[in-house]
């Protein structure tokens, strides 16, 4: 279920301040964050944000198509190595 329009998008305060600082200084360094629940805002477009997936920070370059989605959608938390191959007999 989507968030109420009157509440607006949720972004952690510390992440928003880091984004504003990076915008002011034209920094190209990735912004590390553990906040997977924060929504991608138009101010973040063009920045690289390193999103924590439980083990490491995955760098993600934010583009216009990502606006409105949650950061956690772009850093997979589970590794799938495929099903074990069946033993074939001749």
Curated annotation (Swiss-Prot):
InterPro entries reported for this sequence: Ribosomal_uS19, Ribosomal_uS19_bac-type, Ribosomal_uS19_CS, Ribosomal_uS19_SF
Keyword Transferase: no
The keyword Hydrolase is assigned to this record: no
Cellular component annotations (GO), alphabetically ordered: cytoplasm; small ribosomal subunit
Coiled coil regions, renumbered to chain: none
Keyword entries, A-Z: Ribonucleoprotein, Ribosomal protein, RNA-binding, rRNA-binding
Any GO MF annotation of the entry: rRNA binding
Chain intervals with Basic and acidic residues compositional bias: 15-27
Entries under Pfam families matching the protein: Ribosomal_S19
Alphabetical GO biological process terms: ribosomal small subunit assembly; translation
Ranges for region Disordered: 1-30
PANTHER family in UniProt: RIBOSOMAL PROTEIN S19P FAMILY MEMBER, SMALL RIBOSOMAL SUBUNIT PROTEIN US19M
Function: Protein S19 forms a complex with S13 that binds strongly to the 16S ribosomal RNA.
Family indicated by similarity: Belongs to the universal ribosomal protein uS19 family.
Name recorded for this polypeptide: Small ribosomal subunit protein uS19
Organism: Alkalilimnicola ehrlichii (strain ATCC BAA-1101 / DSM 17681 / MLHE-1)
Gene: rpsS
């Amino acid at each position: 279920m989507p968030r109420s329009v009157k509440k607006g998008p949720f972004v952690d305060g510390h992440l928003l301040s880091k984004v504003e600082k990076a915008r002011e200084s034209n920094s190209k360094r990735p912004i590390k964050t553990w906040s997977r629940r924060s929504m991608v805002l138009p101010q973040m477009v063009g920045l690289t944000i390193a999103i924590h997936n439980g083990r490491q920070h995955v760098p993600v370059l934010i583009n216009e198509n990502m606006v409105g989605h949650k950061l956690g959608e772009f850093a997979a938390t589970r590794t799938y190595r495929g099903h074990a191959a069946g033993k074939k007999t001749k």
